Amino acid sequence: MDRIDFRSDTVSWPTPDMREAMAHAQVGDDVYGEDPTVNALEARAAAKTGKEAALFVSSGTMSNLIAILSHATRGDEAIVGDAYHTYCWEAGGMATLGGVVPHPLPVDQTGRMALADIEGAVRGDDPH
């Protein structure tokens, strides 16, 4: 599969055809699942990534918080790469908004953490 760059909307610009499509897009209330454009986008993203479903959100920061908070709750710790966007550039959102404490680990040039580092960082249940 080709690499899909989801870094930010700031690294891409809409083409004239994209702007034209936006001007003529059908719209509806996406809160109630009534926006055909959002529904089609979510279906397309799910199909492209081989997933059962997809969720459109307004920013990468929001998507990162949703991912973290779907797996952790206040007081939990999240193991993250020390160069990851969610750790370096999101204003401490996981801690500030979610109460989840980041546990940063070093990453290599490809952005990967070493398995041994991850295994060493996992903490057992704390009765305190």
What does each of the following model-derived ranges do?
Residues 85-86, 90-96, 122-128:
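Short, flexible, glycine-rich and Lys/Arg-enriched loop motifs at helix boundaries
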Residues 4, 53-56, 76-78, 101-103:
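Structural motif
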Residues 63:
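Binding-interface segments
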Residues 67-75, 93:
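Glycine-rich loop at the start of a catalytic domain that most often binds anionic cofactors/ligands
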Residues 67, 81-82:
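Alpha/beta catalytic barrel-like cores
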Residues 1-21:
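N-terminal amphipathic/basic leader segments beginning at the initiator methionine
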